[in-house]
Amino acid sequence: MQIRYSASPVSASLFKDWEHVVLRMLLLIGACLLGLNAQAATGDIATIDRSVWPEALETPQLFDVASRAQILSFAHQLLESENLSDIQLADRLGLRQLNMATVNLIRNRLWARLFDNWKAAEQSCEADASFCVLVDDVPMLRQRAAEYKVADDSFYARWAAPADAFSQRYLNELLRMAALFPQTSSEVERYNSDELSGDEMPDRTFLLNFESGPTAADGATDWLADFMRQQKINATFFVLGKSLQSRIDSTSPQALQTLYRQQCVGLQGWEYRSHAHWNGWQDSIERTATLTQQMLPDNFVPLFRPPYGHRRADSAQFFRDQQLRVSLWNIDSQDGTGRISAEQTAHRVLTLMLLWRRGNIVFHDTTDKAQQAVPWLMANLAQSGISWEDCHIYPQQLSDEADQDAPEDEDSDEPEDQQRADQPQQSTDQAEEPGEQGE
């Protein structure tokens, strides 16, 4: 006898309801996966294999050739991005909404910086005319960017496509930060003229920064500080108060002073967390400043490095009262993300040095990548004509130069740039704490 199962009206209805639920869940999962894929694509870190560049940077002129090439590649991608609609740009950056006012502000700043860098890089065109084109102003630079193309039979042909990919990804990094600013603060823009970024340095001048330390004894911090002394250069180590106290407790104040001998030590707060939406952000900075000045009076520099670049838009007066300056950066190694290798980190930094020609280079002394990347940079740039800034005179040198340039009859005590007139003035900085430590 064959037994047949027939669904009752109730069971059939329940089945259809479950069918709809499962279908909705599958659609939701699919949408999430697509969103994650889009975010992963737009969130790719810009890297490049420097071996595709055919010449060692063994003279200042060859540094300039590579610099001019990188400037043109990036300028071409910047120009191309301006042809995108707001919707297309949002999709490319993986964002729902864009702050186009800040995006356009940053684009204009980028053009101005690229033009300044081009004028510096073209000084050696008589010695080597590679990538030399006539550029008298920003509109002409935009025209050259539109015309830019590396011929298939060029000596530099292997470099062209990887360079364009790097430039587009790096531009995405900058425009994404711009699109979120000032709601989410970052290093892409300053809130006032007291804040530093590294753009203030002279051409071919760079300062190494190591942050998030110190490590436990005999860790990466020790290795890097020793290496700096061996190379007869110095760097600014931005320390976390909690880690500094732990290092003191496990060793001694004398050992700490030996660790940072000849180096500079700035502040990064008590913990590595956003100082934009932490109720205890002021106490975090004050506690770290007090401890650092007590333990390392000869190394202390009055600079605060905000974790993730996050700080409050209304914090300027606090920092003035504390006699501190916010120190941002313009060359991010991305070594703290855990997503690129030490070699990729080194190649990325060198490429950005060619593009920006000056600035603060940020590494983390809590990872082992800087131990490989920094020596590689030193070796590959030894004859390039660059110089490493002395951390002891930065930014005091800038302050002295500003005092010399100021009008003699200027007696106003009002702080400059309470809020910059050329950028959005409100910041809620509502972003959640980043999931990864690093810039």
Regions of interest found by a model, annotated:
Residues 2-5, 15-17, 22-30, 37-208, ...:
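Terminal accessory/targeting
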Residues 138, 142-144, 150, 154-158, ...:
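Metal-dependent polysaccharide deacetylase catalytic core of the NodB/CE4 family, i.e.
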Residues 182-199, 275-293, 346-349:
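Short, composition-biased local secondary-structure segments
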Residues 211-212:
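Alpha-helical, coiled-coil/dimerization segments enriched in small aliphatic residues
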Residues 277-280, 339-343, 371-376, 402-403:
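Histidine/acidic-residue-rich catalytic or RNA/ligand-binding cores of hydrolases
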Residues 342-354:
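A short, acidic, amphipathic alpha-helical segment used as a generic capping/interface helix at domain edges
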